């Protein structure tokens, strides 16, 4: 099954943290890290390594990314720029966005406008010659949801990075 039954979710919530690594019921790889800083470095490194490997194979990379946590953006941009990893074949599907009470996008300068935040912190620090093309940045809004769904369905997603709400 592709979803987690609510009763199974509650079972997972009862597993003590020190028993998660290597748990026999895991369906995805799991690692415990020391703190958010280490998680940010790990997220950045894994994504850069994936893009570089797929570039070397001549294959595009498709990822779903959250807006937060913000701790992985600096390591991401530093690694992409230092290694000269081209993001020309990277498609990025943004998993979230904040809307106003009417379901409309927040103003561009609103502190909770995720697109503005991502443009500044995820894309903004990347050298222009390495950048993700605008057409391969899929922003999730009510008006774009169907197009994003269709684009995701076109080919497998290579990596989905999860966020956590500490920011």
Residue ranges and their predicted role:
Residues 1-63, 81:
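N-terminal glycine-/serine-/threonine-rich phosphate-binding loop
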Residues 4, 8-27, 85-163:
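Ligand-binding beta-strand-loop-alpha-helix segment within the catalytic cores
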Residues 31, 74-77, 91:
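Boundary/activation segment at the start of structured domains
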Residues 44-55, 77, 81, 119-123, ...:
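Generic structural signal for well-ordered alpha-helical scaffold segments
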Residues 60-66, 160-161:
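Short glycine-rich phosphate-binding loop at a beta-alpha junction
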Residues 65-70, 164-166:
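Glycine-rich beta-strand-to-loop/alpha-helix junction loops that act as flexible
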Residues 68-72, 98-99:
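Short active-site-proximal "capping" loops at secondary-structure junctions
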Residues 70-85:
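Glycine-rich loop at the start of a catalytic domain that most often binds anionic cofactors/ligands
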């Amino acid at each position: 099954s592709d979803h987690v039954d609510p009763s199974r979710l509650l079972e997972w919530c009862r597993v003590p943290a020190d028993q998660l690594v290597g748990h026999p019921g895991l369906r995805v790889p799991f690692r415990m890290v020391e703190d958010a800083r280490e998680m940010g470095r790990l997220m950045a490194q894994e994504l850069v390594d994936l893009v570089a490997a797929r570039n070397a194979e001549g294959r595009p990379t498709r990822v779903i990314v959250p807006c937060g946590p913000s701790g992985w953006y600096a390591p991401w941009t530093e690694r992409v720029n230092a290694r000269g990893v081209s993001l020309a074949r990277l498609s990025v599907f943004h998993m979230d966005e904040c809307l106003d009470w009417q379901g409309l996008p927040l103003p561009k300068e609103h502190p909770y406008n995720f697109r503005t935040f991502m443009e500044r912190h995820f894309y903004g620090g990347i050298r222009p010659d390495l950048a993700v093309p605008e057409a391969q940045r899929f922003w999730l809004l009510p008006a774009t949801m169907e197009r994003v769904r269709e684009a995701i369905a076109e080919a497998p997603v290579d990596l989905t990075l999860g966020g956590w709400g500490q920011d």
